[in-house]
Structures are given as structure tokens and as C-alpha cells.
A protein has these predicted regions:
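Short capping segments at the starts of secondary-structure elements
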Residues: 23-27
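Residue-level detection of the helix-turn-helix DNA-binding "recognition helix"
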Residues: 46-51
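The alpha-helix within a helix-turn-helix
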Residues: 31-33
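Short alpha-helical segments that sit at the start of domains
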Residues: 1-17
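Long, low-complexity, charge-rich intrinsically disordered regions
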Residues: 1-2, 6, 70-98
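Helix-turn-helix DNA-binding helix
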Residues: 42-43
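Short Lys/Arg-enriched helix C-cap and helix-to-coil transition segments
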Residues: 54-69
Length: 98
């Protein structure tokens, strides 16, 4: 298989991070642990979800200190999460994620 394009890997990374959030892997440290991606990449990917019209927001834990909480997907926009679930092995292989 040839090397995947940067466009494909960027798209798949966004889909995979959105999927992880929807499955409860919903903090930057948890995303880093699940994927092995650096903190900055995880943060940039979270920000980039809006470019796919995926609505993702940070929800502060009530009564917790500053920036303690988790991310939540409130709208998948044009993305079908069932497609992501069906293609998880391909997505993870393309991104070299465990």
C-alpha cells in the first residue's frame, strides 16, 4: 500500500478523535494515550473538527478547578459515525494507531 496523503491522514485523524470523544475518550490526555499523538496535535485536531462541521465543545466539570472537564460531540454535521465505526480498522491502520 502506498503512503497515504496528508489530506487523508488529516481527515482520518479528525474522524478518529471525534469517534474517541463519542466513546468516552474525551480529554486531551486520554486522546494522547489512546493514539500516541503529541499534546499539540491532539489540541489542533480538536480545534479542526469545526472545519468538518462537527460540533465539539469543552464542558467544564461543575465545581472543578479551571480547565477540568471533557469534550463532547453535540452534532456530527455531515459525518456518519456508523461509517467511522465500520472503518475503524482501516482508519487506525492508515494512521498507525494502536
Amino acid at each position: 500500500m502506498s503512503e497515504p496523503s496528508k489530506t487523508r491522514t488529516s481527515f482520518y485523524r479528525r474522524l478518529y478523535v471525534a469517534w474517541l470523544i463519542s466513546q468516552g475518550t474525551d480529554t486531551v490526555p486520554a486522546i494522547m494515550e489512546a493514539t500516541g499523538m503529541p499534546r499539540r496535535t491532539a489540541q489542533d485536531t480538536l480545534t479542526a473538527l469545526a472545519e468538518l462541521d462537527i460540533s465539539c465543545a469543552f464542558e467544564q466539570t461543575e465545581g472543578a478547578r479551571h480547565l477540568q472537564g471533557h469534550y463532547r460531540i453535540s452534532d456530527w454535521g455531515p459525518i456518519n459515525p456508523a461509517w467511522i465505526k465500520a472503518k475503524l480498522p482501516l482508519i487506525k491502520e492508515t494512521l498507525s494507531y494502536p
